Amino acid sequence: MIKGFRDFILKGNVVDLAVAVVIGAAFGTVVTTLVNNIIMPLIAGIVGKPSFNDVWAFQIGSDPANKLLLGAFITVLLNFVIIAAAIYFMVVVPMNHVIARRNAKLGIKAGEETPDPQIVLLTEIRDALKSRS
């Protein structure tokens, strides 16, 4: 039982996933710091407030606690867009470049798909069954 658990944990996918989660958490901290300490102060210089949280806040009814906070939504949306852009330009673009260089080195052309081995095997089985009948 312990051997099976050890084999499961040491599989490449589980280890890769664990590394990705740790690196993702660290990267999230870096991007959050970028947004909170660099980008939002720049926006505060333009808008006049450190975030949009209080910019478009509308009270609904007579209860002061009942507010529609459009500015808070815009702040979160802006944070999301900045984080997505940072991930795209700092992770996706370099990885695509590395993959393209590796494919060029191996002689794999862009758009050229290698067939799935399972599909190839199933095609061979189908052809063998056709030739029998």
Swiss-Prot record:
**PANTHER family referenced in this protein's UniProt entry, alphabetically:** LARGE-CONDUCTANCE MECHANOSENSITIVE CHANNEL (PTHR30266:SF2), MECHANOSENSITIVE CHANNEL MSCL (PTHR30266)
HAMAP family in alphabetical order = MscL
Pfam families tied to this protein: MscL
- Lineage in the entry? Bacteria, Bacillati, Actinomycetota, Actinomycetes, Micrococcales
Q: Which GO terms describe its molecular function?
A: mechanosensitive monoatomic ion channel activity
Bilayer topology annotation: Multi-pass membrane protein
**GO CC annotations, alphabetized:** plasma membrane
What is the name listed in the Swiss-Prot or TrEMBL entry for this protein?
Answer: Large-conductance mechanosensitive channel
**TM stretches of this protein:** 14-34, 73-93
Q: Where in the cell is it found?
A: Cell membrane
NCBIfam families referenced in this protein's UniProt entry, alphabetically: mscL (TIGR00220)
